[in-house]
Amino acid sequence: MMEPVYYTVDSIDGDYAYMTSDSGVENQVAMFLLPEGTTVGSRLVRENFEWNLL
């Protein structure tokens, strides 16, 4: 079981969201993997290989 990791979406460029975790790690994720309704400023959690909006 993976620990949850919390992210804030910083920008969206085409098919990719650029986000930063609460610990400062930057990440790039394909939009099709993220929940519908994800926008700039969204708070997300990744847990057990799933993304969820907070």
Predicted segments, located by residue:
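Short, Lys/Arg- and Gly-enriched loop/turn segments at beta-strand edges
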Residues: 49-54
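Short aromatic-glycine-enriched beta-strand elements
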Residues: 15-19
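Structural detector for short beta-strands of small beta-barrel domains
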Residues: 1-12
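Short, structured beta-strand/loop micro-motifs enriched in basic residues and often containing a Trp
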Residues: 21-29
